[in-house]
Amino acid sequence: MESPIQIFRGDPGPTCSPSACLLPNSSSWFPNWAESDSNGSVGSEDQQLESAHISPAIPVIITAVYSVVFVVGLVGNSLVMFVIIRYTKMKTATNIYIFNLALADALVTTTMPFQSAVYLMNSWPFGDVLCKIVISIDYYNMFTSIFTLTMMSVDRYIAVCHPVKALDFRTPLKAKIINICIWLLASSVGISAIVLGGTKVREDVDVIECSLQFPDDEYSWWDLFMKICVFVFAFVIPVLIIIVCYTLMILRLKSVRLLSGSREKDRNLRRITKLVLVVVAVFIICWTPIHIFILVEALGSTSHSTAALSSYYFCIALGYTNSSLNPVLYAFLDENFKRCFRDFCFPIKMRMERQSTNRVRNTVQDPASMRDVGGMNKPV
């Protein structure tokens, strides 16, 4: 979900000594406490000193968090994509959207090592091309994640509130087409990030920053414009659509005891709806804090206290952490994903369990069963 935070992380601060690290100077849409003004001059000396008292332990802690996010997120999301590709029964409309979300999260986790290095070195040592790529991946991840979650919510709304229309709309093919459209739409921002992104040497402090490069004479205007656009189109509007969809779904679920002609199918429908709701809720919880910081900064009410700067760092880390949480949620909340994960990790054990189950079913037929031979719930 989900995540221009990386641009912030790719931007070094004015100084970083063993005793204190300044907040990185950012040309992204994130708050900038020690940022250069429209003329390119660094903030006042008193302001810099005021914002400089950040414990050197903070970059180390955040680097440790990013290391966990990198391993869990990359492995977990790769496993999710493999499972959806490998197992035919997993190719449902909902899972096609989950594949898209996993792809975006897996891509952004690949930037974690670079972001960690910047936190520790307080400079961008990887060159201009890689800077453009990292910034672009950040914006792609942010927009594709929230757009995909929005479409998943709309998909659930149609499945719950308009089951007849769902037969035509909710197909794997149409879900794939929508995913392609999401990436094309996100490209309007991602390609712009490639064009505008780049490195800049700050000779006054002898560091290299990786950020969006706006014209110096119009820097403040473009910076504010970028923050407002991201806040509105990548957070406010999608979240409002999601809230409307789930409000209508809750009203529908409360008013009807049985959504379909089968109790088992109805259970699966509610189960998948709950899964999507949890994934969306976790995304909003992880990303709301940093968006609040953005809103506060845009209103000009920033603080240079140690607590504020430390909170800012960890809100960014929280946003990135979301990229590693979804595979864990699938494993705990969805029986089909859990079964496929176990089948991949423990193939011999799962094969023996299936053989045992098949022998029992051959002996005692259960006409009410809604599970296939592999033990998977039928897709809804």
Curated annotation (Swiss-Prot):
Where is it chiefly localized? membrane
Q: Does the keyword Cell membrane apply?
A: yes
- What InterPro entries does the annotation carry? GPCR_Rhodpsn, GPCR_Rhodpsn_7TM, Kappa_opi_rcpt, Opioid_rcpt
Biological processes annotated in GO: adenylate cyclase-inhibiting opioid receptor signaling pathway; behavioral response to cocaine; cellular response to glucose stimulus; cellular response to lipopolysaccharide; conditioned place preference; defense response to virus; eating behavior; estrous cycle
| Stretches in topological domain Extracellular | 1-57, 120-132, 197-222, 297-311
**Lipid attachment points (S-palmitoyl cysteine):** C345
So which stretches are on the Cytoplasmic side? 86-95, 155-173, 248-274, 334-380
The annotated topology with respect to the bilayer is: Multi-pass membrane protein
Q: Name any one GO molecular function.
A: dynorphin receptor activity
Give the residue spans that cross the bilayer: 58-85, 96-119, 133-154, 174-196, 223-247, 275-296, 312-333
Where does it live in the cell? Cell membrane
Keyword annotations for this protein, in alphabetical order, are: Behavior, Cell membrane, Disulfide bond, G-protein coupled receptor, Glycoprotein, Lipoprotein, Membrane, Palmitate, Receptor, Transducer, Transmembrane, Transmembrane helix
* Keyword Glycoprotein on entry: yes
Question: Phenotype when inactivated?
Answer: Mice are born at the expected Mendelian rate and show no obvious phenotype. Mutant mice do not display analgesia after treatment with the synthetic agonist U-50,488H. Unlike wild-type mice, they do not show reduced locomotion and increased salivation in response to the synthetic agonist U-50,488H.
Q: Which Gene3D superfamilies match?
A: Rhodopsin 7-helix transmembrane proteins
Q: Which domain of life is it from?
A: Eukaryota
Query: CDD domains under this entry?
Result: 7tmA_Kappa_opioid_R
- Cited function: G-protein coupled opioid receptor that functions as a receptor for endogenous alpha-neoendorphins and dynorphins, but has low affinity for beta-endorphins. Also functions as a receptor for various synthetic opioids and for the psychoactive diterpene salvinorin A. Ligand binding causes a conformation change that triggers signaling via guanine nucleotide-binding proteins (G proteins) and modulates the activity of down-stream effectors, such as adenylate cyclase. Signaling leads to the inhibition of adenylate cyclase activity.
Oligomeric state and interaction partners are given as:
Interacts with NHERF1. Interacts with GABARAPL1.
Q: What is this protein called?
A: Kappa-type opioid receptor
The root-end lineage is: Eukaryota, Metazoa, Chordata, Craniata, Vertebrata
